[in-house]
Structures are given as structure tokens and as C-alpha cells.
């Protein structure tokens, strides 16, 4: 049985490939665009059966000439995740139409289809639950994900021939994101800032939040991969699911976890947030005028639906997850 992973050389895709490998699954077709060649490193430690360029893959899908038999599932992680990319033509072709064509093919072939949606569909909302009236995307990236989610909702009413699951990823961090540049996680940037300068910068107070007190639902990519495989194990489950921890944590906590993990590797003791600030290992910079009124101070996934689907595992909190991530970066990137 063959499994197809799109975006396989990317951040979440390569972690799904790795998680499949840990189960002994290696009959994997890795689909990606390696124009950004350094992404190959994410696949180098994985076992796959074949690599296929994204453009050739979608051509074969559209012409119904893929040569693989007995495809067990498609994990579709290939998309443009740059929220600052405002090229609507590219975004809708790459994120919406590509995904729609894959859905149609998987439904024709009765193949389970697990795809990446995004918490960006909620825009600046304060309630993050999988309900249409709460979804107000603010950019074309969020809209491309939102629009496809609406397709799934309609298809579910009409009846599906095979499982389809969309995961609304919140703030994912972890290994194999180094190619993402400015779109890499805050944990990634904090690590490199601390290693280069010896301190981490955070935004100061704004819009009722104190210094560094803005919060996000930070979720480890290890948990993201586990949940993808949980639904792979349960083909009777379809729908759209938030994929966060259900816990909102401050940027202060993330910065402290990163700095303390680096200090631990240097043989130094853990410091409290107060001590880190007093020693100027965490510094606060004025909140940028350009972001005032546009910056989201809080996100937190409502994971009620995920729990109702039977997923019982606990998530890494920021301290534990970032500690594991920093150890990986020190071993692989430093």
C-alpha cells in the first residue's frame, strides 16, 4: 500500500513522513517543489519510495494517469503558507484549485484525503471554533483555506466516498522549519536571536496587553504529526478540526523556555521570567505603529470537536515542546 505526502520536503509534511517511518511505513511517494533546494535536508533523514515534482504530480492527477496502485491515503500539506504573499492568482491556484483537484481525484478513487487548513480562517476573531459564522479571513492566504473548507462542508452534506479531514493548524513550531525564513515560528527566531545576540526581543505593551503578554496557541509539530496519523487510523472520521493545544500561552513563556533551554545546554541554571528580564536576556521593544489595530493579541483553539473524535493524548506545553525543539536545533542547526 502506497501513501502520498504532498509538501513532503516542507515543515509539517516531512514530520508526517518521519512519523510514518517510525511505524515502519516507507512505501511513501514524496511530492514537493524543490526549487528551494535546501529543503531536501528535511527528507534526507527519512525513508521514501519515490520523489515526484509537484507540477508533474498534479498533471498526472488531472489526467488520471498516476502509476501507483493501492494508494492508502493522501496527506496534502503542499501549499503556500506565506500570509504576507498577496498574489491572489497564485494563492488561489496553488492552495485552492490544487487542493480541489486532489479532492476530486481522491473521491473518484475512494482514497482518504487529509489536508492542511489553517487557523487563519478565523481572522481577528476571539472565538476559535469550527463554525461558519466565526470565520472571517483577513488575507488571501486565509481566504484560500476558508474557501476550500466550504467545499468540504458542502461535499459532506452530499455524501463522501472516502474520508476527508481538514486540520486548522494554529501556531506550529518544531524541527524542519528552517527553510521557511521569516515565516518560521517565533521559537525558531528566538533561538537564533539568542544565539547571535545573547538576548531575545519581544513586543512591549499594546491594546491592554502588558509587555510580552500577547498570547498564542503554540503547538508542537510532533503533536501535529501524531494527530494526522490518528485520523489516518480512523478512516470513519471526516470533517474540519482545529489543531492546537487548546491552551493559550504568552510570548513571555515562549521566550523564557527558549532562553532557558539554551542556558541549560551551556550548563547554566534556569531563571524566572523576572530574572531573565532583569538580566536583559529578554528585552521589550516598543510596539510597532504599523501593527497597531491589526495585531491579534490572543488565539486559542477550541479542541472540543477533536476530543469528541476520540483523540485523548496530552499535548506538549510550551516549556516541554520548546525544550525538545531547542535540543534538536543545537544538534542539527547550530
Swiss-Prot record:
**Which InterPro entries does the record cross-reference, listed alphabetically?**
Epimerase_deHydtase, Heptose_epim, NAD(P)-bd_dom_sf
| Cofactor binding description | Binds 1 NADP(+) per subunit.
Q: Name one Pfam family in it.
A: Epimerase
- The residues annotated as the active site are 141 (proton acceptor), 180 (proton acceptor)
Catalytic activity from the UniProt record: ADP-D-glycero-beta-D-manno-heptose = ADP-L-glycero-beta-D-manno-heptose
Q: Main EC class of this protein?
A: isomerase
Top-level division of the source organism's lineage: Bacteria
Q: Which GO terms describe its molecular function?
A: ADP-glyceromanno-heptose 6-epimerase activity; NADP binding
NADP recorded as keyword? yes
For the biological process aspect of GO, one term held by this record is: carbohydrate metabolic process
User: Is this entry keyworded rRNA-binding?
Assistant: no
* UniProt pathway annotation: Nucleotide-sugar biosynthesis; ADP-L-glycero-beta-D-manno-heptose biosynthesis; ADP-L-glycero-beta-D-manno-heptose from D-glycero-beta-D-manno-heptose 7-phosphate: step 4/4; Bacterial outer membrane biogenesis; LOS core biosynthesis
Q: Where does NADP(+) bind?
A: 11-12, 32-33, 39, 54, 77-81, 94, 145, 172, 180
Residues binding substrate, per UniProt: 171, 182, 189, 203-206, 216, 295
Coiled-coil segments on the chain, per record: none
Per the entry, which co-factors are needed? NADP(+)
Job of this protein = Catalyzes the interconversion between ADP-D-glycero-beta-D-manno-heptose and ADP-L-glycero-beta-D-manno-heptose via an epimerization at carbon 6 of the heptose.
Query: Family, per the entry?
Result: Belongs to the NAD(P)-dependent epimerase/dehydratase family. HldD subfamily.
Per its UniProt record, what NCBIfam families does this chain match?
heptose_epim
**Domain-related comment:** Contains a large N-terminal NADP-binding domain, and a smaller C-terminal substrate-binding domain.
The subunit field of the Swiss-Prot or TrEMBL record says:
Homopentamer.
What protein name applies here?
A: ADP-L-glycero-D-manno-heptose-6-epimerase
**The organism of origin for this protein:** Neisseria gonorrhoeae
Please name the gene that encodes this protein. Answer: hldD
Amino acid at each position: 500500500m502506497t501513501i502520498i505526502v504532498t509538501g513532503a520536503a516542507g515543515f509539517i509534511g516531512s514530520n508526517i513522513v518521519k512519523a510514518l517511518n517510525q511505524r515502519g511505513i516507507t512505501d511513501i511517494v514524496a511530492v514537493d517543489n524543490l526549487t528551494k533546494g535546501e529543503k531536501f535536508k528535511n527528507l534526507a533523514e527519512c525513508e521514501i519510495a519515490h520523489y515526484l515534482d509537484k507540477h508533474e504530480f498534479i498533471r498526472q492527477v488531472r489526467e488520471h494517469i498516476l502509476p501507483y496502485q493501492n494508494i492508502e491515503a493522501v496527506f496534502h500539506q503542499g501549499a503556500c503558507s506565506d500570509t504576507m504573499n498577496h498574489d491572489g492568482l497564485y494563492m488561489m491556484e496553488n492552495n485552492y484549485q490544487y487542493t480541489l483537484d486532489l479532492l476530486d481525484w481522491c473521491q473518484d478513487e475512494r482514497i482518504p484525503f487529509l489536508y492542511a487548513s489553517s487557523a487563519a480562517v478565523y481572522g481577528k476573531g476571539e472565538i476559535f471554533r469550527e463554525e461558519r459564522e466565526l470565520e472571517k479571513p483577513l488575507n488571501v492566504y486565509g481566504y484560500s483555506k476558508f474557501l476550500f473548507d466550504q467545499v468540504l462542508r458542502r461535499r459532506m452534506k452530499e455524501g463522501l466516498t472516502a474520508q476527508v479531514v481538514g486540520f486548522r493548524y494554529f501556531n506550529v513550531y518544531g524541527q524542519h522549519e528552517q527553510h521557511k525564513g521569516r515565516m518560521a515560528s517565533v521559537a525558531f527566531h528566538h533561538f537564533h536571536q539568542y544565539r547571535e545576540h545573547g538576548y531575545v526581543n519581544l513586543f512591549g505593551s499594546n491594546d491592554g496587553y502588558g509587555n510580552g503578554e500577547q498570547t498564542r496557541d503554540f503547538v508542537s509539530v510532533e503533536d501535529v504529526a501524531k494527530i494526522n496519523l490518528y485520523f489516518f487510523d480512523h478512516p470513519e472520521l471526516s470533517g474540519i478540526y482545529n489543531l492546537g493545544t487548546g491552551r493559550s500561552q504568552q510570548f513571555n513563556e515562549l521566550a523564557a523556555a527558549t532562553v532557558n533551554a539554551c542556558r541549560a545546554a551551556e550548563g547554566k541554571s534556569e531563571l524566572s521570567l523576572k530574572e531573565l528580564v532583569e538580566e536583559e536576556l529578554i528585552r521589550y521593544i516598543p510596539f510597532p505603529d504599523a501593527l497597531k489595530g491589526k495585531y491579534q493579541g490572543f488565539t486559542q483553539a477550541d479542541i472540543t470537536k477533536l476530543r469528541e473524535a476520540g483523540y485523548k493524548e496530552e499535548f506538549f506545553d510550551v516549556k516541554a515542546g520548546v525544550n525538545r525543539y531547542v535540543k534538536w536545533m543545537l544538534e542539527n542547526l547550530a
